[in-house]
């Protein structure tokens, strides 16, 4: 996953900024939100966000939709480390699982499902099967 923010700012500067943010706003998560390359969706007007940890992924997607003024009939997908996260997941959980070594969580958005893998697809189907005979 390529990030324009990473290209523009050296690692040490990014790490120092993320550390400063998490110390100053301990209930907020430093998130970088950028448009996926080759996506025909609108550019977002700002890419740095301080996101409450109790915000769901679905609520964050709503914020992105509003920032890019995306009509409700148009689709939007967000990707974190090439994965489509569950909309009910809390941003704090996603942050802990996927934050970059610099301390930021990098989110890509696109008008199409460019990576095609969801968190559910990564699970082993056998782990989800239940033997109904053993439930009795």
From Swiss-Prot:
UniProt superkingdom: Eukaryota
PTM text: The C-terminal 20 residues are removed to expose Gly-116 at the C-terminus. The C-terminal Gly is then amidated with phosphatidylethanolamine by an activating system similar to that for ubiquitin.
Gene Ontology terms describing biological process: autophagy of mitochondrion; cytoplasm to vacuole targeting by the Cvt pathway; endoplasmic reticulum to Golgi vesicle-mediated transport; lipid droplet formation; membrane fusion; piecemeal microautophagy of the nucleus; protein localization to phagophore assembly site; protein targeting to vacuole involved in autophagy
Keyword annotations: Autophagy, Cytoplasmic vesicle, Lipoprotein, Membrane, Protein transport, Transport, Ubl conjugation pathway, Vacuole
Lipidated residues (Phosphatidylethanolamine amidated glycine): 116
Major localization class: membrane
Cellular component GO terms, alphabetical: autophagosome membrane; cytoplasmic vesicle; cytosol; fungal-type vacuole membrane; lipid droplet; mitochondrial membrane; phagophore assembly site; vacuole-isolation membrane contact site
Membrane topology note: Lipid-anchor
Matching Pfam families: ATG8
InterPro entries: Atg8-like (IPR004241), Ubiquitin-like_domsf (IPR029071)
Cleavage, annotated site positions: 116-117
Propeptide residues, chain positions: 117-136
GO terms of molecular function: phosphatidylethanolamine binding; protein tag activity
Keyword Lipoprotein: yes
Keyword set includes Glycoprotein: no
Family of this protein: Belongs to the ATG8 family.
Name this polypeptide is given: Autophagy-related protein 8
